[in-house]
Amino acid sequence: MSVAVSRAYELGVKEVSIPSAGNAAGAMSAYAALAGIKSYVFMPKDVPSPFISECKALGAEVTLIDGLITDCGKAASEGVKKYGRFDISTLKEPYRIEGKKTMGYELAEQFDWNLPDVIIYPTGGGTGLIGMWKAFDEMEQLGWIDSQRPRMVTVQSYGCAPIVKAFEDNTEFAELWNDAHTIADGLRVPAAVGDFLMLRSLRESNGIAIAGSDEKMLDSANLIGRTQGIFASPEGGATLAAFLKLRETNWIKETETVVLFNTGSGHKYSHLWESD
């Protein structure tokens, strides 16, 4: 997001807009505030309140939509067309991917230019997965790594798993997921613009798409907290739940190196722990 807003600033953009279930909106609002750019955020009205409060505190104008992220996208698009705002929606501009791909570069550097065997990533819009795959291709062209790639694993919720279904059905594009629901707002994306790019990275890497229950997500987030000292989001918990399932079936071998990505803080989902 830093790259996207920085480039918008270089281009003289005065207003930026995004539909988001939380984390992307917070990041855009923060960088836009620093750059002196007005930010407009469109969120589902049922997202946890910390996501909304963060954006407002950072100066964003927040519009709550009665619907899903796809409905927010339509509302944001109307503002883009009417007022000429710079659209930072997923894959509507090229710069967010350029920022996301630095995860791949950082990972390679930390592993001394030998990539892990498996990467498990929680997937909504999919920019993280797509960005890392782009980074690996670039690093091979630069001669920094060889042609060996990690097996990429995308994780979704049983309540919203369009990429999993498309992967299992062996289709190039994912169908719209009806009645999308999950406690992990970052995974509640019933239709992703970059679906074909995600599916391509999974298949080219001999990876897999896997879904799990909200209950397992939360249990695994708790396990991460109690063993690693990290207050992970449900999305992060989903990656551990997927890992445990794939180890149980021996899809992941005991000797393999595996990286799990936690993409958010449990603090923004504190309501999920209030009953404990």
Show where each model-derived region lies.
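Active-site nucleophile and cofactor-binding loops and adjacent substrate-binding regions
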Residues: 16-24, 91-96, 121-125, 212-213, ...
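Small/polar-residue-rich loop-to-helix segments that shape phosphate-bearing ligand pockets
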Residues: 39-115, 167-172, 180-199, 210
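Glycine-rich beta-alpha junction loops
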Residues: 69, 92-94, 123-127, 134-136, ...
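Active-site/ligand-binding loops adjacent to catalytic centers
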Residues: 70-85, 138-232, 275-276
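Glycine-rich ThDP/TPP pyrophosphate-binding loop and its adjacent helix/strand module
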Residues: 107, 112-134, 141-142
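Phosphate-binding loop/pocket of nucleotide- and phosphate-handling active sites
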Residues: 175-181, 237-276
